[in-house]
Amino acid sequence: MAAAIVVAFSLGALLPTAFGRSKAPTAVRTALARSQNVQGAPGRTMVLSKVVVEPGAQLALHHHLGTQISRIAAGTLTYTARKGFAVLHSGDAEKDPKFVRHIEAGQTAPIHPGQWLVEQPSDNHEAANRGSKPVVIYLATLLKTGAPPATPVSKP
């Protein structure tokens, strides 16, 4: 069974719970599959993950220590590039992928279901779910073996 871990939380908005207390909305990453020492990429691990971002959750500024492809399955993710750029695509990835745009440093863009981002290790970014329904993201990441799925970055 894949372990689910909390990967980010909001520092601001709080949601009421059934017990009268409040909790910060979260994003939960579940590793679905993994392969170490991928052919042609020794010392790397390929990871397939699912992330569910609750309404109001903010993903802190971070980067990945390898190339990552993120496809939005449900909800709308608000994505902000802080360093480098992400490449946004849409459509059928195998038959008819369409380039949508680059999201350059300092730009924010909504990412909708059926769209996907390609991020490189040099790209720092943050994201949020500003909607009322969960955002579901499927990720394929080629990381250095032993590297965390995301590495926090200090804001300037």
Task: For every predicted segment, state its role.
Residues 64-65, 104:
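Short, small/polar residue-rich loop motifs at catalytic or cofactor-binding pockets
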Residues 51-55, 83-123:
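Short acidic-glycine-tyrosine-enriched beta hairpin
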Residues 25-60, 66-67, 73, 81, ...:
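A short glycine-rich, His/Asp/Glu-containing loop-to-beta-strand
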Residues 71, 78, 118, 138-141:
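Soluble periplasmic/extracytoplasmic beta-strand elements of cell-envelope proteins
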Residues 11-25:
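Bacterial Sec-dependent signal peptides at the C-terminal "C-region" and cleavage site
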Residues 2-13:
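Bacterial N-terminal signal peptides
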Residues 61, 79, 107-108, 119, ...:
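Short beta-strand His + acidic residue motifs that chelate non-heme Fe in jelly-roll/DSBH
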Residues 21-39, 44-45, 124-156:
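Double-stranded beta-helix
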